[in-house]
Amino acid sequence: MNPKTSSPMVSIFLILGGAVFLVFGSLHALYTVLDLRNPRRLVPVDPSVAQAMANTALRLSPGDTNMWRAWIGFNFSHSVGVLLVGALAVWAGLRISTLPSAIMPALILIGCVYLVLALRYWFPDPAIGVAIATACFVAAWLRSLI
């Protein structure tokens, strides 16, 4: 990157945005683990729906898994993806002077994709968190251009 990007504000914005992703990814993973023993967070309100999921095969893999196990797997893999984005952003903030210039637009793109998903399919808290994190990535990129 060019010398302009070595501003401490660029690093701070990247680390803050990454921290938001890390917090949400960690909470999502923790809630998924806790739901294995006592389902009450990332589960349907109606317990009969979760029971139906456990008793229903996944059409892509009949007999190999059920919808409940697939749901748990989707939640874990989603957590891993969010954690990796957060870790990448924090790492980028710590290594700002040696980064390729495309890292910030890539983080912004990833943040925007998560924001669209959050607004369309999730609930307000993750959407707000993703919006804040993505705004931090945009601020870092804009600051790097000054």
Task: Name each model feature, range by range.
Residues 2-15, 91-102, 142-146:
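Helix-coil boundary and interhelical linker segments in multi-pass alpha-helical membrane proteins
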Residues 2-12, 59-72, 98, 124:
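Juxtamembrane loop-transmembrane helix junctions in multi-pass integral membrane proteins
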Residues 8-22, 69-79, 83, 101-108, ...:
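Alpha-helical transmembrane segments of integral membrane proteins
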Residues 19-29, 76-90, 108-115, 134-141:
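Hydrophobic alpha-helical transmembrane segments of multipass integral membrane proteins
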Residues 10-45:
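N-terminal signal-anchor transmembrane alpha helix
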Residues 19, 44-91:
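Core segments of alpha-helical transmembrane spans in multipass integral membrane proteins
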Residues 40-44, 105, 111:
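Membrane-embedded alpha-helical bundles that constitute the cytochrome b-like, heme-associated redox core
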Residues 93-105, 112-131, 144-146:
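Membrane-helix boundary connector in multi-pass membrane proteins
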